Amino acid sequence: MKVIFSVAVLVLASSVWTSLAVDFILPMNFHMTGELLQKTKALCIKNIQLCWILSYFKVSEPICGSNQVTYEGECHLCSGILYEDRTVIKVHDGPCEHSSDESEH
C-alpha cells in the first residue's frame, strides 16, 4: 500500500509541475530599444538551461518576435539571440499576423 501511495504522489507531483511548467517570461514591447534587447539577452543567458528541461515536459506556445517571425516559444527566441546573434525581442504571445515560420529563417 505504501508503494502505491508513493507512486501516486510522485505521479501527481510531476503532473502538477508539468502543467505549471512554462517558458520563462521575457519582456514584451512593440518597439525595440537597446536597453530592452540587453534585458532580454540577460534573461536568455540566465534561463537558457531551463529550455532543455522544459522541452521534455511541455510543448512551447508560439510567440511573435520583433522581426515578424513566429518562434516556437521563448526558448527558440533565446536560441536565436544567443547562438545566431539575432537582434530580436518578444512582441507578443501567439503567432505573428503576417509571419513566416522561424524554421524558414
From Swiss-Prot:
| Tissue-specific expression | Expressed in epydiymis, in the cauda, corpus and caput.
Please indicate which residues carry the site annotation Reactive bond.
I53, L54
- Bridged cysteine pairs (disulfide): C44-C78, C51-C75, C64-C96
Drop me one GO molecular function for this one. serine-type endopeptidase inhibitor activity
Gene3D superfamilies under this entry?
Answer: 3.30.60.30
Domain (Kazal-like) spans: 44-98
> What is the protein's major site of localization?
secreted
Q: Can you supply one Gene Ontology CC term for this chain's record?
A: extracellular region
Q: Which Pfam families match?
A: Kazal_1
Q: Where does this protein reside within or beyond the cell?
A: Secreted
Question: Per UniProt, which keywords does this protein have?
Answer: Disulfide bond, Protease inhibitor, Repeat, Secreted, Serine protease inhibitor, Signal
The region annotated as signal peptide is 1-21
Reported function: Probable serine protease inhibitor.
Listed name of the protein: Serine protease inhibitor Kazal-type 8
Q: Which organism is it from?
A: Mus musculus
